[in-house]
Amino acid sequence: VDLSELEWHARRTLCFTRCRRVTVDGPVLLGAAHWTAAFFGCEDVTVKNLAIFGYRENSDGIDLVNCTRAQVSRCYIRTGDDAVCIKAMEPPPAVGGRDILVEHCTVWNDKVRALGIAGESRGEIYNIIFRRCTVLHSLADWAAEVGALCVVLCDAGTVHDIVFEQIDVLDERANGINCMLF
């Protein structure tokens, strides 16, 4: 699906809100105008074999926002912003984000984060695993809270039990690992 003719910020490409048992398998998405695959308050999400080729600011790859029980695997993500990030934009009593596995993904990001917990952290985020992924390139130059592997807490939420294992970072232009609390 070629979205490159859309104006910047025209719309999100794939957007799921408060859905259960969602599976996204195999699409190729090119030139998203805004967040490419966004899940808000979803449960039991599976994303696999997704290919994203983005270049614009705010063209996040996969954003799991206030989600529970999600798996992201075997995806290729090239973005002009975050590649795969967990976010908690709704405050409690909403679920912040929990029981999420991201594995066997290859990412390339410009501007912000390749893999991690993003600054939108208003709830409790926990039991998150990033493993066996490759960061081909990370040019994190937009702000201080950037890097290839990030945990950023800048709202009233909490973050615990976050694991990064067997992650290969081949080219990082700012911060390889960045953990910020503010």
Where are these regions (language model features)?
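Extracellular/periplasmic carbohydrate-active domains that bind, remodel
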Residues: 1-182
